Design a protein with these regions (language model features):
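A short alpha-helical cap/connector motif
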Residues: 1-136, 141-162, 166-231
Length: 231
């Protein structure tokens, strides 16, 4: 028997997270990636697309391509002259993603870079690829804090930064956790809370992907005043 949150997830997906043939085809190919169906859900993909549209993003950076499912959702927020750069560790995943992105008709605006994100980010800085209007972090968890620091370097005031999987099924509550992934997001969450360059929050996500969360941050304007009671 399906749980209530699963039924609600499906209800929302049928209303607002409808997959077209390209997304359905991409979803089927995820089983061939190195992480299986670890991609975002349709509802989460639509949520990311809405956020990217809200800032009228023309330049988007994604850390963690996998099979290109989230890439397609987010890239569809771009204007025709927009660009999305996505970083993927595994060549096999990048190859799958490239085929899916071509099928979706987004190949001209999507640039897939293969390698360790922590090595590719300095290259983007050297290329003066930024600033990006929207940044989505969904890569390996241990260096999430470092990814966030790089996201800030490659952003501008008003940039939205989103990081996925920051609750880890509630395991972030365990301060003595020895899990490197949990420790990575714990470091990230603490850094997010303490950083004065952004206004941020974390939203719990409950649905077909069970219990997790997304961090959402907006890079502050230089003149942004602290919210009363936040000091």
């Amino acid at each position: 028997m399906k749980k209530l949150f699963e039924k609600v997830d499906q209800y929302i997906a049928k209303l607002l997270g409808v997959e077209d043939p390209a997304l359905k085809s991409t979803q089927k190919t995820m089983k061939h990636t190195t992480m299986g169906f670890a991609n975002v859900t349709a509802n989460q993909g639509k949520f990311l697309q809405v956020l990217a549209r809200s800032v009228q993003a023309k330049k988007i950076l994604e850390l963690g391509t996998l099979g290109g499912y989230s890439t397609i959702w987010i890239a569809r927020a771009l204007p025709l002259d927009g660009q999305l750069i996505t970083l993927e560790l595994e060549q096999v995943n990048a190859d799958i993603a490239r085929k899916n992105i071509i099928k979706a008709g987004l190949d001209p605006m999507v640039d897939i870079r293969v390698g360790k994100a922590i090595d590719l980010l300095p290259i983007l800085e050297a290329e003066d690829a930024g600033p990006f209007d929207f940044i989505f972090i969904d890569a390996d968890k241990p260096p999430y804090a470092e990814y966030f620091e790089w996201a800030l370097k490659l952003s501008r005031p008003g940039t939205i930064i989103v990081a996925d999987n920051v609750i880890r099924d509630g395991k972030v509550l365990d301060k003595s956790s020895k899990d490197e992934k949990v420790q990575g997001v714990q470091r990230f969450n603490k850094m997010l809370a303490e950083n004065k360059q952004v206004t941020a929050t974390i939203i719990q996500t409950v649905g077909s992907k069970d219990h997790d969360g997304m961090a959402i941050a907006v890079v502050n304007q230089a003149t942004t005043l602290p919210i009363k009671g936040s000091l």
